[in-house]
Amino acid sequence: MKRQSERDSSPSGRGSSSSAKRPREREREAEAGGRRAAHKASGGTKHPVPARARDKPRGSGGGGGHRDGRAAGDANHRASGGRSSGAPGGGGRTGKASGDPGAGGASPRASPLPPPPPPPGAEPAGPGSTAAPEYKTLLISSLSPALPAEHLEDRLFHQFKRFGEISLRLSHTPELGRVAYVNFRHPQDAREARQHALARQLLLYDRPLKVEPVYLRGGGSSRRSSSSSAAASTPPPGPPAPADPLGYLPLHGGYQYKQRSLSPVAAPPLREPRARHAAAAFALDAAAAAAVGLSRERALDYYGLYDDRGRPYGYQAVCEEDLMPEDDQRATRNLFIGNLDHSVSEVELRRAFEKYGIIEEVVIKRPARGQGGAYAFLKFQNLDMAHRAKVAMSGRVIGRNPIKIGYGKANPTTRLWVGGLGPNTSLAALAREFDRFGSIRTIDHVKGDSFAYIQYESLDAAQAACAKMRGFPLGGPDRRLRVDFAKAEETRYPQQYQPSPLPVHYELLTDGYTRHRNLDADLRVRDRTPPHLLYSDRDRTFLEGDWTSLSKSSDRRNSLEGYSRSVRSRSGERWGGDGDRSIAKPWEERRKRRSLSSDRGRTTHSPYEERSRTKGGGQQSERGSDRTPERSRKENHSSEGTKESGSNSLSNSRHGAEERSHHHHHHEAPDSSHGKKTRESERNHRTTEAEPKTLEEPKHETKKLKTLSEYAQTLQLGWNGLLVLKNSCFPTSMHILEGDQGVISGLLKDHPSGSKLTQLKIAQRLRLDQPKLDEVTRRIKQGSPNGYAVLLAIQSTPSGPGAEGMPVVEPGLQRRLLRNLVSYLKQKQAAGVISLPVGGSKGRDNTGMLYAFPPCDFSQQYLQSALRTLGKLEEEHMVIVIVRDTA
């Protein structure tokens, strides 16, 4: 009764009286709504306004005044929600029940927003977009599952590295099977590589490959951060969109995990629930994405999309420390490799890491059992190679353990490697930016290269430049410098690619060919990997073909044409005309047979003399007509004991030519009428004999020096004896590289007896720090030219020079090889020091110091001649510096 009286006294009594019939009316209206929906589907045109008009007072009665307060602001949302959520057979009532919170008595909530429009300037992804979206990653599929991973990586790396800096990773997906991700540094490089792959069918081991770009979603971090809060208000999904082969490819779990690491933890939703705030929300999303950490995002774009093959479960590939080299002040070309297996070898480490660059040094440390795992230090040629290896190999399993990789200590020198240069960077720009730190000695840079070497006069200037210029923008807004120390006397190219010395059968390339940008980059990365045996000739021709852009390919063709022209010109100078060039190979074979036959005592005709006669033409025939019977008899006498159809050997030809020359001199005075013709004939004969001498010179060399021991035998022996360290002695031979012999004989002798010293005991060590090395250099300059000597110390052999004077090893000393002493000094990073003379001296008239340096940057400056002769120094050696004290 009370409720009935309240209903009677309410202003809307009629409307509220009808609310008692609400359950039955709902059933009838639901049935009527179903009939209306069916009628509408069959072509009816009944207007749905009365249904919405009846819903409005019912909503106000159920929701109260709060619903009325929001009715004006949310009318558009309710109308759009009712239309979008209505389904056939359910009518508008079903849409109202599912979209209107007031029907259930709960607090009202705004209906979900449609997806906001893209921000101004954003590029839509997909094939239907007007502007092509950018991508840095290519997905390579249809790979053969039977090929080894290393060979597959090498072949793909060789195909795509010519387009720019890349990193490559193999993976496996359930849909595509074996795939590879090729990540480029710049989007234009990736686009150029894909265009070439589409222009011509890419084959690998007779198998066509499929190349597709991988687009990264714009603003992905903000969408992911707000996905949890908007999950409840997401509208029902529409029909599935057609497959987009060029859209964003869903990758495996490891990649999604890395993408999630870019978003801030527990980030609040940034979008306002109003359509009019969509543009502002996108601006906030962009600001939030920029604040997440651009260095990590750039590292992910450059080296991302790596699979988890070979990594332990749960390993996070992209962590806080994976900064780009220009952002990481700790980045050096030295890598620390931890958690290694005790049985790991240097060959295994080189095989695993050499694909990322040139490794100069590998040092493996194996602590005792129970004191930790083994670890190693790898020194790459430059910082780019080291960073590429660090990112790609972190967490990979070598042996049985997943390795840990970090940067090692830097080795400061006066020479800097500067990377990250743009193609238009000039020497003047480098000099202008780096000259402010100190005096520059040299700048080694070829226009178009992405790196340069800068040599300073002092170590302090190099250290200041390395610290201040790392990350400096030079060459454009998107390029920043990478700076690291390099070898003090390092040449521009690695030793294995030095143009000299070359074997006899190699040809030197022209300057335009060797300094071409793309070919230069090929030399720097990893052209040392041999092609696989399954790699057919047709594939090799395709891979070594022209895969660059039109401008680059034209440059390469020009350089190749210049190179071929130079080779043809050299060949023409060497072999004469085309007819001579066609018989060059038989001459080579006959020359080899001639060298063998001369050793056996048989003489054959010299092809070079025959060629000179043929090459001379008419002059040669005149020379033949001038031959007197007396000269013919002398020639026949010089070739006595041979067959008539045979010919003279090279030595006999020279001997005959000398006799003929002597014969001309003998008859020149009495026969003055023929003097001019005789002198001309003599010049021709001298030309004839000079050519075989020139071509025969390599044969008369003793032999090509191949080892450091052979090179040392060409030097003067300075001292031979035993170097003693603690309880070990090392037989050593010292050969003079430069300096005064008197310093050696004056300081390396026993003063009481006056005899030569046979033992030198190392009692001190000198740390290989730059200030101490500068002090040694200063003492050498003060003692020049007669106050110092530099010697090359190698292992003394029983059959070597001075071996007969080797002293007998004293009791208690263990004879060991010199390489053990070198390894000890390398490990200590020090040089051995001996005060001279041994035993001390009463005065300072004849005193000095001996420094024994292991192979290091300081010692290499005295072995440049050996490096030019041998190419590389593989034997263990030391450089001995003896300096006499100055008053």
UniProtKB/Swiss-Prot annotation:
Keywords in UniProt for this one?
Isopeptide bond, mRNA processing, mRNA splicing, Nucleus, Phosphoprotein, Repeat, RNA-binding, Transcription, Transcription regulation, Ubl conjugation
Instruction: Provide the protein name.
Output: Putative RNA-binding protein 15B
Ranges of residues in domain SPOC = 708-886
Read off the lineage from the record.
Eukaryota, Metazoa, Chordata, Craniata, Vertebrata
Q: An example of a Gene Ontology BP annotation on this entry?
A: RNA methylation
Per the record, where are the segments of Pro residues compositional bias? 111-122, 234-243
Specify where it is mainly localized.
nucleus
Q: Which GO terms describe its cellular component?
A: nuclear envelope; nuclear speck; RNA N6-methyladenosine methyltransferase complex
Positions of short motif Nuclear localization signal: 590-594
Q: Where is this region: Interaction with Epstein-Barr virus BMLF1?
A: 719-887
Source species: Mus musculus (Mouse)
Q: Point out the cross-link Glycyl lysine isopeptide (Lys-Gly) (interchain with G-Cter in SUMO2) in this chain.
A: 210, 699
Q: Which Pfam families match?
A: RRM_1 (PF00076), SPOC (PF07744)
